[in-house]
């Protein structure tokens, strides 16, 4: 095709061709170097005659009511100048139609129908009631965090999705 758009997780920019745990990575093996996946992708498109630009875009900056960062690669075979898209929406703007869309903006007019909603246990509900809009398990009282999280409390990572409540006044 004359043009293409490819999207992926932003981690593709730092992904090595050969995945090896960090502690076991051989600094002298080029395939284990960070960013080698992207290097190969760019090289292959260049061999096919494409001029490319790439970057990380966040859907919230383009009218989607969600923070969602994605790697985007745009290519052209026509030797035309191509650019990453300019954001259309902003956290603050004097014109409301150019501001980030919130969860509330998106669902405000929907009819409430809980037909088949997930049923939470009494214990889980008791934790969720303590978490403010836009918060997560870290907003629980300190003495309840370990109880609420169970075995996941000791696991690595940020765990921000656990006991998460969306904010009606923010993108999700």
Task: Tell where the protein language model's regions lie, with residue ranges.
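Conserved Class I SAM-dependent methyltransferase catalytic core
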Residues: 1-68, 72-76
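S-adenosyl-L-methionine-dependent DNA methyltransferase catalytic core
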Residues: 44-47, 70-172
């Amino acid at each position: 095709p004359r043009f293409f758009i490819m999207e992926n997780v932003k981690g593709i920019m730092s992904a090595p061709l050969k995945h090896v745990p960090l502690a076991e990575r051989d600094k002298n093996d080029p395939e284990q170097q960070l960013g080698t996946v992207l290097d190969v992708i760019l090289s292959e498109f260049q061999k096919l005659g494409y001029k490319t630009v790439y970057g990380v875009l966040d859907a919230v900056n383009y009218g989607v009511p969600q923070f969602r960062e994605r790697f985007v690669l745009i290519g052209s075979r026509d030797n035309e100048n191509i650019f990453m898209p300019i954001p259309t929406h902003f956290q603050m703007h004097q014109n409301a139609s150019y501001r980030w869309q919130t969860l509330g903006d998106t669902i405000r007019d929907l009819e409430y129908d809980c037909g088949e909603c997930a049923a939470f246990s009494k214990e889980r509900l008791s934790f969720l009631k303590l978490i403010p809009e836009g918060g997560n398990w870290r907003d629980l009282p300190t003495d309840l965090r370990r109880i609420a999280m169970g075995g996941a409390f000791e696991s690595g990572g940020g765990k921000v999705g656990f006991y998460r409540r969306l904010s009606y006044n923010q993108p999700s």
